[in-house]
Amino acid sequence: MKKNTMKKYMSSAALGLPLVLLLAGCHKTPEISYAKDVEPIIKKNCVECHLQGGKGFVASGFLVESYESLMKGTKFGPVIVPGDPLSSSLYRLVAGEVDKSIQMPHGKDPIPASQITTIENWIVQGAKNN
């Protein structure tokens, strides 16, 4: 009897394991596109202050007019560390992981959580110009 029970268990495991592995792969984050996903968030929430002559540009030297200017960062250094959102000040500023007085967008409603997650995932995926 023990042999039959063990055989049933092994059969169930052999059938179930591939299914579990398949389902685990279904939750992979899709590739985030700078042009399609991130740039619209930046344009909607950051452009007003971070263009030439804007208050954000004057204070920090940070322009968001292109991918290149975004990756260049501020006069103090880069704001994005590809692969590492927690070391990326852009992510930390919009995610509210800083003092409220410097949270971005400054003086406006916070960026929706889903859009912050998009920025985070884009950085995790290497902050590519795609």
Outline where the language-model segments fall.
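Hydrophobic alpha-helical segments, especially transmembrane helices
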Residues: 8-9, 116
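Short, surface-exposed loop and linker segments with low hydrophobicity and enrichment for Pro/Ser/Thr
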Residues: 11-14, 27
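Aromatic- and Gly/Pro-enriched helix-to-coil junctions and flexible linker segments
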Residues: 23-130
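Intrinsically disordered, low-complexity segments
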Residues: 9-10, 31
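N-terminal secretory signal peptides that target proteins for export/translocation
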Residues: 1-8
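Compositionally biased non-globular segments, especially hydrophobic aliphatic-rich helices
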Residues: 8, 16-17, 130
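Bacterial N-terminal signal peptides
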Residues: 13-22
